[in-house]
């Protein structure tokens, strides 16, 4: 059998909890919050790329 390491002891609880469902909503609101923050971040990047948001010290030159 394999050798036990500190890393395997640290990761074992994550593996033993795999497949178990937390009652109720669990961490769904937290996931929704992070998805919303990611959406806002990507939206800001897109607006900078399309020059919808004009930043004085920042310019985007694509192509020639």
From Swiss-Prot:
GO terms for biological process: photosynthesis; protein stabilization. It is a single-pass membrane protein. Keywords: Membrane, Photosynthesis, Photosystem II, Thylakoid, Transmembrane, Transmembrane helix. One of its GO terms (molecular function) is phosphate ion binding. It comes from the Bacteria. GO terms for cellular component: photosystem II; plasma membrane-derived thylakoid membrane. Its main location: membrane. It is found in: Cellular thylakoid membrane. NCBIfam families: PRK02624.1 (NF002728). PANTHER family: PHOTOSYSTEM II REACTION CENTER PROTEIN H (PTHR34469:SF4). This is Photosystem II reaction center protein H. It comes from Prochlorothrix hollandica. The lineage of its organism: Bacteria, Bacillati, Cyanobacteriota, Cyanophyceae, Prochlorotrichales.
């Amino acid at each position: 059998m394999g050798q036990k390491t500190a890393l395997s002891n640290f990761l074992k609880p994550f593996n033993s909890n795999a497949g178990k469902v937390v009652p109720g909503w669990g961490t769904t609101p937290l996931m929704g919050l992070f998805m919303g923050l990611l959406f806002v971040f990507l939206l800001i990047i897109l607006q900078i790329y399309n020059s919808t948001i004009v930043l004085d010290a920042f310019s985007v030159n694509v192509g020639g």
